[in-house]
Every structure is written in C-alpha cells, then in structure tokens.
Curated annotation (Swiss-Prot):
A GO MF term: DNA binding
Record gene name: mukB
Family: Belongs to the SMC family. MukB subfamily.
Membrane spanning residue stretches: none
Function: Plays a central role in chromosome condensation, segregation and cell cycle progression. Functions as a homodimer, which is essential for chromosome partition. Involved in negative DNA supercoiling in vivo, and by this means organize and compact chromosomes. May achieve or facilitate chromosome segregation by condensation DNA from both sides of a centrally located replisome during cell division.
Protein's cellular compartments: Cytoplasm, Nucleoid
Residues annotated for ATP binding in this entry: G34, G35, N36, G37, A38, G39, K40, S41
Record protein name field: Chromosome partition protein MukB
Organism: Klebsiella pneumoniae subsp. pneumoniae (strain ATCC 700721 / MGH 78578)
UniProt keywords, alphabetically: ATP-binding, Cell cycle, Cell division, Chromosome partition, Coiled coil, Cytoplasm, DNA condensation, DNA-binding, Nucleotide-binding
Free-text note regarding domains: The hinge domain, which separates the large intramolecular coiled coil regions, allows the homodimerization, forming a V-shaped homodimer.
UniProt cross-references to InterPro entries, sorted A to Z: MukB (IPR012090), MukB/SMC (IPR050308), MukB_hinge (IPR032520), MukB_hinge_sf (IPR042501), MukB_N_dom (IPR007406), P-loop_NTPase (IPR027417)
GO biological process: cell division; chromosome condensation; chromosome segregation; DNA replication
Lineage, opening ranks: Bacteria, Pseudomonadati, Pseudomonadota, Gammaproteobacteria, Enterobacterales
Subunit structure: Homodimerization via its hinge domain. Binds to DNA via its C-terminal region. Interacts, and probably forms a ternary complex, with MukE and MukF via its C-terminal region. The complex formation is stimulated by calcium or magnesium. Interacts with tubulin-related protein FtsZ.
Chain coiled-coil ranges: 326-472, 507-602, 780-805, 832-1110, 1209-1265
Length: 1482
C-alpha cells in the first residue's frame, strides 16, 4: 500500500511576530490555539502563500470581511511581514519518502502601493538532520541571528553534496514540480487552475458552504473528459487549422500574386530602364566611335577636296585665259566667215546682176524693135482711124442730108457731097488741084508708087540706121567695157587699152584656172597644219596631264607602257570588282545572318533562361536535348517513387488516424457495437471499469484479461441470456462477465504472475499464458500514452507527408517546367550562342568593312590610275598617227607659199570673175574701137525725114483711095436735087454709115488697143532702161563693195571659213564646257568643302557632346553597376532579350510597369516614396535602389515558416508548391473532419454515465459524515432537460437537421449551437456567439446539474444552503464538499502522476469555535479515514483531544513584538509532553 505524502513542518522567517519559527505539522489535525491577534491567521497565511505564491489571488481577510471583494490595501500580506528578507517554507515527505522543501522568499517593496516581491524555490535531497531554520538564518552569537538572502541560501546549498536548489521564474513551473513530487493534488497548468485551487483553500480557510464552490461544482468535481474533449479539441483544432490553412492559402495566394506582380512589374520597370541605359550607353559608344571615324574621314575628305580645289582652280584659270584667246579667234573666224559669206553673196549678186544686165540689154534691144514696129502700126492705125472718122462724118452728113430729104436722092446727094469732100481732101493732100474722079485711079497708082518708094526708102534708111545704130552701140559698148575694166579713158585710147586688157585677161584666166588646185592644196596643207597644231596642243595637254615632258620619239614606248599598265590595271580592277563583289556578298551574307541571329537571339535567350532555371531547380547541368529528355525520364521515375512513398506515408498516417480515433473512444471500446450492447444489457465495458488503471499496470491487466479485455461486465448473466438469442450485430467473440461494476476486481481469475507474463487458470483443465504486450492499450492512461506515441508518429508522418507532398509538387512542377521547356525551347536551347556568333560576325563585319573601305580606296586609286592611263592611251592613240605631222617643220612655210600663190590666183580669179564677161564681150567687138561712127546723127535725121515722107505719101494714097472708092458717088450729082424723093439712097447711106461707123469703131479700137500696147511697150522699154541703168549702177556698187571687202570669194572659201569657225567653236565650246564643268565642280567642291567644314564642326561638336555624355553616363553607369553588383541583382536586371528591343519599346514597357507599380505600392509609404524618387530619368541608380527596396520588402514578407528561401523569385516557386500542398492538405482535412452527430451524442451520453457512476462512488464516502443535525451529505447529478432533448435529437433525429451539419459555412460547434437554438427557442442566448455556445455544448459538464444535499433531521434530504443550516453544520458540510473535490482531483490526476506517488491532502479551517466537539470529532474521523491533514484555528477555550495543538501568545518585550508558541500533542494524556523545537525563537 502506497503511503500518502505528508507536510512535515511550516517555517516562518521574519514574519510579524515570528523571526524564525517552525511548526511541525501533525499527520491528521494541527490546531492553532490562541487569542485574538495571537498569529493564527498569519501562520495560515504563510502556509497558503507557500502553496500558492500568486499575488493576483492572495487576499487574506478576517472573518469580518467574509464575502467582501476588497480588503486592506495590501490584501493582508504586506502587513504580516517585517522589513527585510522573509521566508515561508514547507517541509514535505512524499510517498517515495523523499524530503522536499518548497517555499517562497518574500520582501516588502518600498512605496505607497505596499507591494510584496515573491520568489518561489525548492530544495531536494536535503538531509533530515538539517532544519529549515538552520538554512534560512545565520547565528551571529548566542543572542543574535540574521536572515540569509536567497543568493546566500543558494550558495550554501550548492556547497552541500547531493542537495539541489531550484529557483522558479514562473508559478506554473513551481506548481508543476510540486505536482510531480506529490505536494499538490492537481496539476495547476494555468491561472484558472490556480484560481480554483485558491478558491478551494479559501473556502476551506474561512469555512462554510462557499457559493464560489457550489456554483462551480461541475468545474471542481467533473473532470474534463480527455477522450471527448480531446476528440472535440482535435476536431476544432483541425477546423482551426483548416481555417489557418485557408488563411495560409489566402495569404500565400496574396503573397504569390503580390510577389509575382511586384517582381514582374518592378523587373519590367527597372530592367527595361536598365537595358535601355545599357543599350543607349552602347549606342552612345558606337556613335562616339562613329563620330570619331566620320571626323577623321571628313578631315581627310576635306584635305582631298582642298587639294582638288587648288588643282581645279588652277585648271580653271588656264581655261579662262585660253577662253579669251579662243573667243577672239572664234570671233575673227566668225567675222571672216561672215565676210566670206558676204563676199560670196556679193559675188553672187554681181553674177546675177551681170546676167540680169545681159538679159536686160537683150530685152531692151528687142523692146526697141517692138516699140518701133508698134509706132509704125500706131501711125497706120491713126491714119486709118482718121479716114474712118472722116468717112463716118461724111456719111453722117450725107445721111443727115438724106434723112432730111428722106429719099435716095437725098442719100446720094449726101454721098455725092461726101465724094466731093473726099475729092477736095485728096486734092488738098495730094496737091492736085486738077484732080478729077476719073483721074483719081491714075493718081492713086502714082501716089501708091510714091508711097511704095517712100516706104522702101524709109526701110533702107531704117536698115542703115540699124546698122549705124549697131555700130554705134558696139563702139559704145566696147568703150564702156574698156572704161568699166580700166576706168575712165579717152575714146582714142580705147583700142590700145582694150588690146592690153585682153592680153592681161588671158594671163589672169590662166592664173584663175590654177586657183582651184592651189585652193585644194592649200586646204590640204591648212588641214595638216591644223592637225599639227591640234596634235601639238594635245601633246602639250598630254604632257601636262602626265606631269612630264615627253619627246615625240618616246611616245610609242610610252604608249606600250600605258597599254601594259591598262591591261594590268584592268585585271586589277576586274579582280577588284570580283573581290569587292565577294566582300559585299560576304558582308550581305553576314548582315543577313546577323539579322537572322538577332531575330533568333531573344528566343534563344528565353530558352537559356528557362534552361538555367531548370538547372537551378534541378541542380543538374545539361549539354544536349538528349540529357534533358533522359533527366525528364528520371524525373518521372522520381515522381512515381515519391508518389508511392507519399501514398505509403499517407496510408500509414490514415491508419494512425484511424487507430487514434479508435483509441479515443470513451471507455476504451474499439468496437462501437460493444457500447450499444453494454447499454442494451445494462452493463459496463470491462475497459471502462479499468479505464483509470495506471500506465505501469496496463500491461499486467491487458495480459490478465487477454481476449476478454473487451468483455462486458453485467450484474446478472441470467438476465442477459434471453437477449443473446438472435443477436447478430456483435463481434465474433463476445465476452460477458458477471459482477458489480461499482466494486469489480480481478478476483475472478486465479493468476500466477511470471516475468513479463501471466498464467491465468481459467479452469482446472484450461490455462492461458499471456505475455505482457509491448504496447498495452488497456486503460485510459495506456491508450493516451499510445495516442501520444501515435500523435508523435503522426506528427512525424505528417511532416514527412508534407515534405513528400512538397517534393512531389516540386517534382511535378519541375516536370511541367521540363515539359514546357521541351515543347517550347528544346529546339533552340542547345544551339550555339547567337550572341557569341553575332559578336564574331560583327567583328568579321568590321574587318570586312575595313577591308572593303581599304579596297574601295585602293580600287579608287587603281581606277583613277586606270582612267589616267586610259586617257593617256586615248591621247596617244590620237597623237601617234600624227607623229609625222609633229615632225614636219616645213609645213607652215609651204602653207604660206601656197597661200601667196592662192592669193594671186584668187586675185586673178576675182578679176576674171569681175571683168571676165566684159572681156568676153569686149573680145569680139574690140575691132569696132578702131574707128568712131560720127555720121549717126545725120542718118537719124534722114531716117526721120523718110518716115515723115512715108506717112505723107500714105495719107495721100489713102485720100486718093477714098476718092476712088467714092468715085461712083460722083455720078449722083443729079440726085442732090432729088433728096426728098430717093429713099434708096437714104438706105444705102445708112448702110454705108453703119459700115463706116463699124469701120471707124474697129479703127478706133485697133488704135486704142495699139496705143495701149504701144504705151505698154514704151513702159516696158522705160522700165527695162530704168532697170538696166539701176542694175548697172548696183553692179558698179557691188564691184566696189567687193573690192572694199577684200576677201577672196572662191568656191571653197566659205567651207574653209566655216570649218575654221566650227573648229574654233568646238574648241571654244569644249573649253567653255570644261570651264563650266570646272566652275560647277569648283562650286560643288566649294560647297562640298563648306559642307565638310560645317559637317566637321558639327561632328566635332557632336563628338565632344557624345564623349561628354559617354563620360557622364559612364559615371552614372558605374554607380548603377556598383549598386547592381553589391545587391546581386544583375542576373535579374540584365535581361539580354531586352537588348533587341528599341528604346521606345523599352520606354513604353517601363512606363506601363510604372503605372502598374504606382497602383501596387499605393498602400506602402516606403515603396511609394522610393518609387516616386526613382522616376527621375537623370538618376537611373534610383531605379536600382527601388528594385533593391522591393526585393528587401519582399524578403521581409516571406513567411519563413513555410518558405525556405530569401529570394522572392524562388519564394514564388515555393509558394506555388506550398499552395498546391496546402490545397491538398485542406481537401484531406475536410474529409477527415466530417464527424457524426450520433457519435457525438453517444460520446457525451457515455461520458455523462461514467461521471454519474463516479459521483455515486464519491457519495459512498460521504454517507457517514454528520455535523449537528446533518446525518449525511451527498451530491445529486441530473441531466438538464433541454440538453437531454438535444442528445436525443443528435442520436435519433439528426437527419432532419443535416442542413446545419452539412453546411460548409458552419463549424460543428456552430451547427450544434444552431440546433440547440432551434430546439429551445425560448432560451435567450444573450451576446454569446454560436461558436461559444457550441463549445459549451460539446462539454459534457454543461449537460449536468449538480447540487449538494444534506440529510438533516426530520427534514430528510434538503438542498445544502447556508440559510437552512447552522454555522457549524454549514462548515462541516462545506468541508465535506471540499474533501470530495480533493478526492475527485486526485482521481482525475492519478493517471498523470507516477503510480508510486500519493499526493498530500491538507485543508484549513479558521475559527473552528463554530464547531462543537462532535463535529470536530467527525472532522478528525474524516481526516483519519481519508488520510488528510487539517490545520484549524481555534480560540483558547478549544482544545481538541487528538492531533497537535499549538498555543500562540503574542507578547511585547522592549518594544519588540513576538509570538510565544507552545506545542502540545493531544489532551487525553495526564501529562502533556512538550514537542521538540517549540522553544521561543523570537
């Protein structure tokens, strides 16, 4: 039998009235007896303070303050202490006979609040010979001692071997040690437990039925159902974990989204700007180099242009000088051509005028003859017209006469008269007065002969006149010709001069005939001379272009050298062309390849980034796609292995969960059917009876009962036999044991205990050997121990499962990443680095461009040399055929000689041309000049007289002819008298008149016509004479002008002059064209020089500015790179794929990210300020600072409990994995958390039943307690009706309320609270939440109503209330309740403490005077029976018969107050024996 631990003594050091006092405590009752103020309450206060050193609970008041909530300012402790160090120490001997000293060090704290400082401590292993006062005080002399400090105590104890001193910083640790060592009955884990314990002590101290205890009897007496409570706590904890998981998911999602958003946008914002500055820096460097190259190139071009300008200016000056000479020569040639053309036109005019003059002379002679003939005819016509007119007049007169007579006679008379008139006119004209009509015929013949004679004479004179006129005109003509050729001369000299002119003309004609040959010869020589001069000019120009003077003999050799050079240069140029084409083709191929690579580079870089991420994630290095696919296969295999291991761990975890759930069943029933059968049979499960068995005894009892440890203990087997028939819903083996469940023991078996085994003699012939199980599950302690082990294993498995799930998720994500990589990037990831190839190509391109530039320069030089050589060969080709000309020095002299001869010939030709016709005309008539015809005038006069004579003869002959014609009329002489009677004559006269008038009309018409013709002939003659004279004058003028011109007007002169002019014009045009070209080239060269100068200045300015920018940017870039490298973000920011974007695209990308970042960091003041500062484009390093700030902010946000990295980018990956794991864990947990309402009702009902049985067992211990009229005390436990109805609904009608329990929005507690409110709508829940109500409903204690009843006299069982009992009865009843609570605590804590520990039991009772002797005896009996210690305080007149009594007397000596203590053991003995150590030690 295990002995119960006991408190040995209480020691007070430096308390008010007690300097160093040790009270030895009795094993049962210790009585403190003394008057008022003797120190009884101080002693008990010291004991309580040592037990519960909690200043928040300690409140020592006297009985006058009973029920008060506030007392003195120091709550009764500060005033009980003296200044300095104070101690209250308990000396305990526990069940293991270990001495344990526990206590507190107290010290007053100065101040108005009167506070006290308390330090608990414990001493183990102290020898029994050492008293507590010896440790706590130090003797100074026989009369003095001092209190040691806590440190000195510690040093003193550490010096003792085997003694352990422990100082506690918390009350919980202090009480934990006291519980483990059996000093207190209950583990006081929390302030609530300490408060309950203190309230218990306080109720014991002050006595009576404490309302605090009775109102909370359920909390004091009913233990928390560890199984039910644990199940519901696990469920609620799981729900809380579920919510935490949900919150973790939400936070993880939020963090992931935030991390993703911030990292992506910040990376885009900063990396775009970073790469833009990097690109701009590279571009600026390239531009600076390009500007420098352009600067040097422009300088060389400017120098070349300046040299070229000087050469062209010199050549232009030469051409300007030559142009004046050429213009003068051209003007002279043009003037000469004009003169030649004028002379030719003059010569043509002369020839034309000469021809016209010859023609006019012929026409004039002809016209003179025509005019003469016309004059003769005119005279005849005039005579005929006059005769006709006369006849008409005569006839008219006759007719008039005849008309007057109106007869023939009249007419004849008229005719006769007219005949007479004609006769008279003939007589007058012919001077023939004797003329008669009859002699008229004779005279007519005579006069006609005379007329004929006159006509012949006139014709003869006319012939003579013509001959004379011809001779006269020939002489005049010859004379005029001689005068025209020789000039004015005497008529007598004409003959000699004419002969001289004719002889000179023959010579001149001979010379003129040679002019054509001379002109041809001269033209040929002049052409050769011009060719010679042109060749000399070309030679001079060639020498000038060649820059060297060459002899004529060296030109052929030079021609061969130039041809050889041309051939060489042509081959070089051809090869250069091919080489240039090859270089350009290679350059184009490089550029095309570069463009292709630049397009492929971002794809390759993205593939490399993905590959690097895969390498970082996998920790592997991949050199080919085959390795990637092989690693993917390894990943698949690893994933399958991890999934298999995870599933195995998950299955083991689920098995453990099931085992934990099975072990957590109340009563230890692993099969829920057993609970139903036990309830049905009215029995109790054997495991429930042994539920409180200790952990050490569990293997024994498990082996003792063997398979029957799941048996049902029933009061009577006979009653169960009837129910066994037809029983199906039961285990295969059902054990039933007959016995009393309240007093069941293991006496039903005969057992022999072996080493770790038992032999159970079931019958005489049947034994069962059972070994102790290695994992016993019999009893609540064993099950809880197993559950703890399973929980630990489950935690390990959960951690392993989480790790495996994480690894699986990571592997799956890695597999997905590899799959994405294979699908998107495998084709290009392992190709050669395009950027490296681009760098090589750029280097090669630079070499090609330099080679091409050098080649272009060389080719340009070769081309210039080739063109120069070609021009030289072309010039030599023109010069070589003219070498003979260049060597001919006499050509100019011969040209001058031929020119002189030609001039003479041309002079002769001009003479012949001018006077050739005159000489030709003069030559046949030159002989007429020998004599001058002087009789021409006399001949002219004779001819005129002959003409007049002929005209007179003609008139006479006509008149006679008219008379002859009218001769018949003379016979009408007799008719004149008969005018009125002769109508025939009138008619004849009329007819004759008409004939005469018609004749007259014809004569007039003929005369008029001939007169007009004559006038016309005269006009023509005058016109011809005038024209002849004019042309003669003009011809003379033309000859004079031709002489004035002084130019030979031969046939080839114009052609030569035009050829010369054209040649000079061509030379002038060529010169002007060249000059214009030079001027334009010079202007262009000057403009080019100006442009180059401006370009040079601009390039110098741009180069300086760009260099300054490069230098400035370099400083900023160095700061940026220093920040980047110091913070290790270069890998994040240097995104090479961005290098292929334009500045506008990067700026747009940065601006978009900036807008998103402004929204993202709007709630973060620090990041918002850093972002605003980073927007300065002139300070790129601030963007890096912002990026670093973002990373730092994200690192601080990383939850290190779930993410094992400091890198936010890696944190995103782990967040993704953790998110998947948490989601899966949430799903699994939700499946596990589905708890059955029926099982909840069964658990609660079973727990209530067990606790009711336990309370009944506690009541058995109080049946014999009596105080005054109280004969017995008991606890009554009932189930509340509202809660009983809830249990019934949960177990039987739960399907009607599945809307609550299946709701995802309600926890089980909340659903239970809602159901309770639905079943009891009349109950006001107040301000409590459904969760709080539900948690209360899950506690079985809230289902029970407990009240204390007393059996008092004749009243029977009454509710224990202070008003219905006397003070002593109330004190006794309250003490009974407290004893029951303590016993209940011990039972509850038995499984938590070692089986060899039985805790101390001690209660207090102040003011025991209220109890009578019988009641005190009852207390003594109760203490003895329950092995409980009791400390009571009683007045001096109370002296118990048993136990130990201390008499306390407070005395004052020399102003020092002390308590005198005398200890007595009982009053039954005749002579009381003083206890040791009771001397006054004040």
């Amino acid at each position: 039998m295990i002995e119960r631990g006991k408190f040995r003594s209480l020691t007070l050091v430096n308390w008010n009235g007690f300097f160093a006092r040790t009270f030895d405590l009795d094993e049962l009752v210790t009585t403190l007896s003394g008057g008022n103020g003797a120190g009884k309450s101080t002693t008990m206060a010291a004991f309580v303070t040592a037990l519960i050193p909690d200043l928040t609970l300690l409140h020592f008041r006297n009985t006058t303050e009973a029920g008060a909530t506030s007392g003195s300012r120091d709550k009764g402790l500060h005033g009980k202490l003296r200044a300095g160090v104070c101690y209250s120490v308990l000396d305990v001997i526990n069940s293991r006979h270990q001495r344990v000293v526990v206590g507190v060090r107290l010290q007053q704290v100065a101040g108005r609040d009167r506070k006290v400082d308390i330090k608990p401590f414990a001493i183990q292993g102290l020898p029994t010979s050492i008293l507590p006062t010896q440790l706590l005080t130090e003797t100074l002399n026989d009369r003095q001692a001092r209190v040691v400090s806590l440190n000195e105590l510690k040093d003193k104890l550490e010096a003792m071997e085997g003694v352990q001193f422990k100082q506690f910083n918390s009350i919980t640790e202090y009480h934990s040690l006291m519980f483990d060592l059996g000093v207190v009955a209950r583990r006081l884990r929390s302030a609530s437990d300490r408060s309950k314990y203190y309230r218990l002590i306080e109720a014991s101290l002050y006595g009576g039925i404490s309302s605090t205890i009775t109102r909370s009897l359920r909390d004091y007496l009913l233990p928390e159902n560890s199984g039910v409570r644990k199940a519901f706590q696990d469920m609620e904890a799981a729900l809380r974990e579920n919510r935490m998981t949900l919150e973790a998911i939400r936070v993880t999602q939020s963090d992931r989204d935030l991390f993703k958003h911030l990292i992506s946008e910040a990376t885009n914002y900063v990396a775009a700007d970073y790469m833009r500055h990097a690109n701009e820096r590279r571009i600026h460097l390239d531009k600076a180099l390009e500007y420098r190259r352009d600067l040097f190139t422009s300088r060389s071009q400017l120098a070349a242009e300046q040299y070229k300008h000087v050469d062209m200016a010199r050549e232009l000056q030469e051409h300007n000088g030559a142009e004046g000479d050429l213009e003068a020569d051209y003007q002279a040639a043009s003037d000469h051509l004009n003169l030649v053309q004028t002379a030719l036109r003059q010569q043509e005019k002369i020839e034309r005028y000469e021809a016209d003059l010859d023609e006019l002379q012929i026409r004039l002679e002809e016209q003179n003859e025509v005019v003469a003939e016309a004059v003769d005819r005119q005279e005849e016509n005039e005579a005929r017209a006059e005769a006709a007119e006369l006849e008409v007049d005569e006839l008219k007169s006759q007719l008039a006469d005849y008309q007057q007579a109106l007869d023939v006679q009249q007419t004849r008379a008229i005719q006769y008269n007219q005949a007479l008139q004609a006769l008279e006119r003939a007589k007058a004209l012919c001077h023939l007065p004797d003329l008669t009509p009859e002699s008229a015929d004779e005279w007519l013949e005579t006069f006609q002969a005379k007329e004929q004679e006159a006509t012949e004479k006139m014709l003869s004179l006319e012939q003579k006149m013509s001959v004379a006129q011809t001779a006269h005109s020939q002489f005049e003509q010859a004379y005029q010709l001689v005068a025209a050729i020789n000039g004015p001369l005497a008529r007598n000299e004409a003959w000699d001069v004419a002969r001289e002119l004719l002889r000179d003309g023959v010579n001149q004609r001979h010379q003129a005939e040679q002019a054509q040959g001379l002109r041809s010869r001269l033209n040929e020589l002049e052409q050769r001379l011009r060719e010679q001069q042109d060749a000399e000019r070309q030679l001079a120009e060639f020498c000038k272009r060649q820059g060297k003077r060459y002899d004529i003999d060296d030109l052929e050799t030079l021609h061969q050298e130039l041809e050889a050079r041309i051939a060489s240069l042509a081959d070089s140029v051809s090869n250069a062309q091919e080489q240039r084409m090859a270089l350009r083709q290679e350059l184009e191929q490089l550029q095309s390849r570069t463009q292709t690579l630049m397009r492929r580079a971002p794809v390759w870089l993205a593939a490399q980034n993905s590959l690097n991420q895969l390498c970082e994630q996998s920790g592997e290095q991949f050199a080919s796609g085959q390795e990637v696919t092989e690693y993917l296969q390894q990943l698949l295999e690893r994933e399958r292995e991890a999934i298999v291991e995870r599933d195995e761990v998950g299955a083991r975890k689920r098995a453990i969960d099931e085992e934990i759930e099975r072990l957590s069943q109340p009563g230890g029933s692993e099969d829920p059917r057993l609970n139903a059968l036990a309830e049905r049979f009215g029995g109790v499960l054997l495991s429930e009876i042994y539920d409180d068995v200790s952990l050490d005894d569990a293997p024994y009892f498990s082996a003792l009962y063997g398979p029957s440890r799941h048996a049902i203990v029933v009061p009577d087997l006979s009653r169960v036999a009837e129910q066994l028939e037809g029983l199906e819903d039961c285990p295969e083996d059902l054990y039933l044991i007959e016995g009393d469940p309240q007093s069941f023991d293991d006496s039903v078996f005969s057992v022999d205990e072996l080493e770790k085994a038992v032999v159970v003699k079931i019958a005489d012939r049947q034994w069962r050997y059972s070994r102790f199980p290695s994992l016993p599950l019999f009893g609540r302690a064993a099950r809880e121990n197993r559950i703890e082990t399973l929980h630990a294993e489950r935690e390990s498995l959960s951690e392993r499962f989480a790790t495996l799930s994480f690894d699986v998720q990571k592997t799956q994500r890695l597999h997905q990443a590899f799959s994405r990589f294979i699908g998107s990037h495998l084709a290009v990831a392992f190709e050669d680095d395009p950027e490296e190839e681009i760098r090589k190509l750029n280097s090669r391109r630079g070499e090609l461009e330099r080679a091409l530039s050098a080649h272009e320069s060389d080719n340009q030089q070769n081309r210039v040399q080739y063109e120069q050589a070609k021009e030289g060969v072309s010039a030599l080709n023109r010069l070589l055929p003219r070498l003979n000309l260049l060597a001919d020095d006499t050509l100019a002299d011969r040209v001058d000689e031929i020119q002189e001869r030609l001039d003479e010939a041309q002079e002769a030709a001009r003479f012949i041309q001018q006077y050739g016709n005159q000489l030709a005309k003069l030559e046949p008539i030159v002989s007429v000049l020998q004599s001058d015809p002087e009789q021409f005038e006399q001949l002219k006069e004779d001819y005129a007289y002959a003409q007049q004579t002929q005209r007179d003869a003609r008139q006479q002959a006509f008149a006679l002819a008219e008379v002859v014609q009218r001769r018949a009329h003379f016979s009408y002489s007799d008719s004149a008298e008969m005018l009125s009677g002769n109508s025939d004559l009138n008619e004849k006269l009329r007819q004759r008149l008409e004939q005469a008038e018609s004749e007259r009309s014809r004569a007039r018409d003929a005369m008029r016509a001939h007169a007009a013709q004559l006038s016309q002939y005269n006009q023509v003659l005058a016109s011809l004479k005038s024209s002849y004279d004019t042309k003669k004058e003009l011809l003379n003028d033309l000859y004079k002008e031709l002489q004035d011109i002084g130019v030979r007007a031969d046939a080839g002169a114009e052609e030569r002059a035009r050829a010369r002019r054209d040649e000079l014009h061509m030379q002038l045009s060529n010169n002007r064209s060249r000059r214009n070209q030079l001027e334009k080239a010079l202007t262009f060269c000057e403009a080019e020089m100006d442009n180059l100068t401006r370009k040079l200045r601009k390039l110098e300015r741009d180069y300086c500015e760009m260099r300054e920018q490069v230098v400035t940017a370099k400083a900023g870039w160095c700061a940026v790179m220093r920040l980047v490298k110091d913070n290790g973000v270069e890998r994040r920011l240097h995104r090479r794929e961005l290098a292929y974007l334009s500045a506008d695209e990067l700026r747009s990308m940065s601006d978009k990210a900036l807008g998103a970042l402004r929204l993202a960091v709007a709630d973060n003041e620090h990041l918002r300020d850093v972002l605003r500062i980073s927007e300065d484009p002139k300070r790129p390093e601030r963007k890096i600072q912002f990026f670093v700030a973002v990373y730092q902010h994200l690192r601080e946000r990383i939850r290190q409990d779930i993410i094992r990295t400091d890198d936010p980018v890696e944190a995103i990956e782990q967040m993704e994995i953790e998110l998947s794991r948490l989601t899966e864990e949430l799903t699994n947990r939700e499946q596990k958390l589905a708890i059955s309402s029926r099982s909840v009702a069964n658990i609660i009902r079973k727990t209530i039943q067990r606790e009711q049985n336990r309370i009944r067992m506690l009541n058995q211990g109080l049946q014999s307690v009596s105080f005054g009229q109280v004969n017995s005390v008991r606890l009554n436990v009932n189930v509340r009706e509202t809660h009983s109805m809830l249990l019934d609904v949960l177990s039987e009608q739960h399907e009607q309320h599945q809307d609550l329990f299946n709701s995802n929005r309600l926890t089980f507690s909340e659903a239970l609270a809602k159901l309770y409110q639905r079943l009891n709508p009349q109950i006001d829940m107040g301000q409590r939440t459904p969760q709080t109500i539900g948690e209360e409903l899950l506690d079985y204690r809230n289902y029970l109503e407990m009240e204390v009843e007393v059996n008092r006299g004749s009243d029977g069982w009454l509710r224990a209330e202070s008003g219905a009992l006397s003070t002593g009865e109330a004190i006794g009843t309250g003490m009974s309740i407290l004893v029951m609570v303590v016993q209940s605590w011990e039972d509850e804590s038995r499984r938590l403490r070692g089986k060899d520990i039985s805790p101390c039991r001690l209660l207090f009772l102040d003011e025991a005077a209220r109890l009578d002797a019988r009641s005190i005896a009852t207390l003594f009996e109760l203490c003895e029976r329950l092995e409980m210690q009791l400390i009571i305080a009683a007045p001096e007149n109370i002296s118990p018969e048993k136990g130990t009594t201390y008499k306390l007397v407070r005395k004052v000596f020399n102003n020092h107050e002390h308590v005198h203590v005398v200890g007595l053991r009982g009053f039954a003995a005749p002579l009381p024996e003083a206890l040791p150590g009771t001397a006054d030690a004040s």
